[in-house]
């Protein structure tokens, strides 16, 4: 909850679709992409865009972009611009490296020697400044402040040994991956192909789904053996609403070619020897939707395990467990289960108070929490309450909630946080306040309970978070018959905890 209030957000979601079989297809590709992006709306609310093609010509790209939410950017009229299409990619954005304006909207489209390419990017390059200078020294002009344009222009560069008559897109993609180690999950569209690419550290998520026939309302006539198309997405949560089933993840460093015929691995670019993968651990903590699947496990299950681990590390004498609706609910349920305490709702959320709500005066601004939440005082009056939250960033959001609960009759209010303190900015795709703004780096942190008005405050340890995330992964890998093959492809299990520990997976270049 606090993350949402304070602007700590994932900045992008990517989604692609390609129809299988005979073209022109009967599959409504633009509509599928739009619905896929709606499923990723939590990853970016500033702008959105879709690029489609009939696949017959590398020049026949149709583009529509706009500022705002998906349902504001795309309607019946704007979708008409994207027909007739057999494949396409889309993007929803929350800015980090580029300012929020239309020219930074993705996907980016550029003309190359071998036709147009469209690129959608989730992540943030750790060496963007150097790459920007390199391109400019080669006479390449840049029209936006987004580092995603750097990726597009680097792909347009002809790599060494490429014949002018044919484009070696795998060589171009590998050239890009050699130029920048992280952070990116990419969709690249050229003519009749979509390439799905994940950086060697696997910092940002990317997965593939298979579109299957919908059948009738009772499920009759549904043939799961038939493939109507392929989709690729930042999160698997976008698959159900479009009639797709989860197929698999794109592995760290993998270059996948998706065509109307099949899904094919073209190459896997390795990390430096000894380096573990570095999937962002905060995807599990907060950013992803709870029904998404990462590394073979559902996000909801991981959050619940975090709550159970928090109960082991930080038990407290109390009467009930609750949460601030609603991202920390799985952790709160896990905490309650482990402690043997009842889970009880103490707040109800006004869902119609959005991020863009205008605060006309100081009084209403100070009443922001009361405006957003209703109090279920009959559930906790005279009782000791444990509130589970996903994070405390600055401390000025949870404090009014504690005050509200006390004024409504809570005897005690204990705060338990289902993640460790955030101490460092991300620099790899998450918009986090400056180091000085984070409560964990300020003097108030040494007496945080008193500062926010709680009876006690305890965070989950870094070790506890990592073990909660990796427990299921390790157990599954131990049972896999193909363990040796799997290890050779993806290497050691690892997760990026840079915002918690300052230990970045690669050296940052500024």
From Swiss-Prot:
Active site: 12 (nucleophile)
Amino-acid positions noted as binding [4Fe-4S] cluster in the UniProt annotation, renumbered to this chain: 280, 426, 496, 499
SUPFAM superfamilies: N-terminal nucleophile aminohydrolases (Ntn hydrolases), PRTase-like
Domain Glutamine amidotransferase type-2 span(s) in chain numbering: 12-261
Reactions catalysed: 5-phospho-beta-D-ribosylamine + L-glutamate + diphosphate = 5-phospho-alpha-D-ribose 1-diphosphate + L-glutamine + H2O
Binding-site residues, Mg(2+): 327, 389-390
Keywords from the named record: 4Fe-4S, Allosteric enzyme, Glutamine amidotransferase, Glycosyltransferase, Iron, Iron-sulfur, Magnesium, Metal-binding, Purine biosynthesis, Transferase
Cofactor(s) this protein cannot do without: Mg(2+); [4Fe-4S] cluster
GO cellular component terms given for this protein: cytosol
Subunit-level organization: Homotetramer.
NCBIfam families (alphabetical): purF
Function: Catalyzes the formation of phosphoribosylamine from phosphoribosylpyrophosphate (PRPP) and glutamine.
UniProt-recorded name of the protein: Amidophosphoribosyltransferase
Gene label: PPAT
